[in-house]
C-alpha cells in the first residue's frame, strides 16, 4: 500500500486523534458493543507493560477488535497522547505493507516518546507477517521500544509464527494472551435475573487441581438455593454458547435468528475447519453428524462418508 493510502485510513479510523473526548460514540466497534444488552470486557489487555510485544489470539467474533478499542479508551484515560496510539486492521494486506504502515504512521505520530501499535487481524497476512515484525523490532530502534499488540483468529497459525518473535517481546512478562468466549460464570451473571449471591461463589474460578472433595462439597452446599436457576442457565449455555453475539441474541429474544446462525457458522468455517478446506455444506453436515453422535462411539470413517 502507498503511504498516502495508509495515512488516509489512519486519520479516518483512528477517531481519537481528532476527537479525543467523544470518539467512543463515533467508533463503529464500540457503538455496536454499546448496543448489546450487557456490558462485558474480558480484560485481557488491561496490564500491558510499555515496550512489550503482545499477541492476542482467539476465535473470530469473540470480541478482540472491541478489546483493542477499549485498550485505546483506557490509555487515553491514563493520559497517553492520542496521536501516540495507532490502530489498524490489516485484513487483506501483505507482509511488506507492515513496514509501509510503520513508516507512514511515524510521520503522523509524536516525534518523541513511547508509542502504542494495535494491529488487528495480523493472521490474515499469509506471506510471513512474523518475519516482518521481527525485522522491524530488530532494525527500527524506536519501534523496538514501542508497545505492540497483534491480534489474530487462527491459533494454529499464530503458534507456528510466534517462534519468530522470540527475543523481541520486550519486558512483557506474559506476552501471549488468549481471548475465549464468555464462560458460564459470567453467562449466569449476564442472563439471570437473580444470580447467586456474591458470597455464595468463590471470588475466582478454581483450577482443576484445586477441586478437592471438600471444596466441591462446600461449593455445592452454598449454591444449593440456586440449583434450579443454575440448571436452567446451564441448559441455556449449552444451547447458546459464549460468543457475545449469541449471548446478546439470547437475552433479547431467547431464540436464535438466521443471521446469528450464519455468523457463527462463519466462525467455525474460518477457524476450526480452515485447513480442512471443507465447503459450507460439508461443514454443516459435519456439525450435524457430530451433534447427533454426542455421547456415543465415534467412527471417523463413517463421518468421512457422510460429508464426502
Predicted regions and their residues:
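Hydrophobic positions on the alpha1 helix immediately C-terminal to the Walker A/P-loop
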Residues: 67
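Conserved P-loop NTPase "ATPase switch" module shared by AAA+ and STAND
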Residues: 110-133
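A short, basic N-terminal segment
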Residues: 1-51
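Hydrophobic anchor at the beta1->P-loop junction of P-loop NTPases
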Residues: 56
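Sensor-1/coupling segment of RecA-like P-loop NTPase cores
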Residues: 139-165
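Conserved glycine(s) of the Walker
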Residues: 63
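Short glycine-rich substrate-engagement loop in P-loop NTPases that contacts/grips substrate
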Residues: 82-112
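Interdomain motor-coupling "hinge/lid" segment immediately C-terminal to the ATP-binding subdomain
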Residues: 159-291
Amino acid at each position: 500500500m502507498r503511504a498516502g493510502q495508509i495515512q488516509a485510513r489512519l486519520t479516518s479510523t483512528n477517531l481519537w486523534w481528532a476527537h479525543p473526548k467523544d470518539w467512543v460514540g463515533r467508533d463503529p466497534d464500540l457503538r455496536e458493543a454499546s448496543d448489546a444488552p450487557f456490558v462485558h470486557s474480558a480484560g485481557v489487555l488491561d496490564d500491558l507493560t510499555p515496550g512489550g510485544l503482545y499477541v492476542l489470539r482467539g476465535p473470530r467474533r469473540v470480541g478482540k477488535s472491541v478489546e483493542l478499542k477499549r485498550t485505546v479508551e483506557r490509555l487515553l484515560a491514563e493520559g497517553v497522547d492520542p496521536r501516540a496510539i495507532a490502530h489498524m486492521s490489516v485484513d487483506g494486506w501483505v507482509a511488506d505493507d507492515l513496514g509501509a504502515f510503520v513508516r507512514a504512521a511515524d510521520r503522523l505520530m509524536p516525534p518523541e516518546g513511547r508509542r502504542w501499535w494495535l494491529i488487528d487481524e495480523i493472521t490474515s497476512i499469509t506471506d510471513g507477517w512474523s518475519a516482518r515484525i521481527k525485522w522491524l523490532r530488530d532494525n527500527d530502534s524506536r519501534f523496538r521500544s514501542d508497545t505492540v499488540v497483534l491480534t489474530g483468529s487462527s491459533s494454529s497459525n499464530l503458534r507456528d509464527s510466534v517462534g519468530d518473535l522470540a527475543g523481541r517481546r520486550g519486558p512483557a512478562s506474559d506476552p501471549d494472551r488468549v481471548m475465549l468466549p464468555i464462560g458460564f460464570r459470567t453467562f449466569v451473571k449476564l442472563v439471570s435475573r437473580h444470580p447467586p449471591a456474591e458470597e455464595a461463589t468463590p471470588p475466582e474460578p478454581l483450577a482443576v487441581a484445586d477441586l478437592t472433595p471438600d471444596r466441591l462439597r462446600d461449593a455445592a452446599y452454598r449454591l444449593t438455593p440456586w440449583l434450579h436457576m443454575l440448571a436452567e442457565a446451564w441448559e441455556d449455555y449449552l444451547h447458546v454458547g459464549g460468543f457475545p453475539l449469541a449471548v446478546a441474541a439470547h437475552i433479547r429474544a431467547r431464540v436464535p435468528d438466521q443471521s446469528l446462525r450464519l455468523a457463527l457458522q462463519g466462525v467455525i468455517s474460518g477457524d476450526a475447519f480452515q485447513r480442512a478446506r471443507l465447503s459450507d455444506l460439508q461443514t454443516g453436515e459435519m456439525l450435524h453428524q457430530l451433534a447427533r453422535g454426542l455421547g456415543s462411539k465415534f467412527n471417523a470413517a463413517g463421518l468421512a462418508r457422510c460429508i464426502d
